[in-house]
A protein has these predicted regions:
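Mature-chain termini and adjacent capping regions
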Residues: 1-162
Length: 162
């Protein structure tokens, strides 16, 4: 009897530990918030891997509306989305861009959707029609209005003759 009880407890514990480590694959996951706060957004991916730690997203796309009604678009190969804290950590081939022909790219980024702050690191490159800036790190806030560059910063300005 003792052996049977121990065996069933072992099985119960084993199945419980497997449930907490289970990864669920989701095709085309999509997260959005509209109208609840000023921070309207939509994040979608080709595939999601849900685990107790969060949701890993593969081939991520997103769009975020600023307080000034400017849309910021984003894409990356990998993202870790935390809906509770409303932030996304991005990796590999990250690009943020606007309809005003402004783009910024890097290897890693975090985007806090509540505050609207985007932090990019490793091989940061900002481009618009007139300026190209390379940096180690960049922090964006207020849409693309406030940009702070850190580390080795190189700026190229194009002067167009009229």
């Amino acid at each position: 009897l003792f052996f049977c009880c121990t065996f069933f407890l072992f099985l119960a514990f084993n199945s419980l530990s497997n449930e907490t480590g289970t990864i669920i694959e989701i095709d085309n996951p999509k997260f959005s918030e509209k109208g609840l706060t000023n921070n309207e957004y939509e994040i979608k991916a080709e595939k999601g891997l849900k685990s107790p730690d969060g949701m890993k997203l593969i081939q991520v796309e997103g769009k975020f509306k600023t307080k000034d009604d400017i849309w910021i678009f984003m894409n990356a190969e990998i993202g870790i989305f935390n809906q509770t804290s409303n932030n996304i950590r991005l990796e590999k081939n990250i690009h943020f861009y606007t309809d005003a022909n402004e783009t910024i790219s890097s290897e890693f980024a975090t985007y806090d959707i509540e505050s609207g702050i985007i932090e990019l690191t490793n091989n940061v490159l900002f481009k618009n029609n007139e300026i190209e800036i390379h940096a180690n790190k960049c922090t964006l806030s207020n849409g693309f209005e406030k940009i702070i560059y850190d580390g080795n910063v190189l700026t190229k300005i194009s002067i167009k003759n009229k």
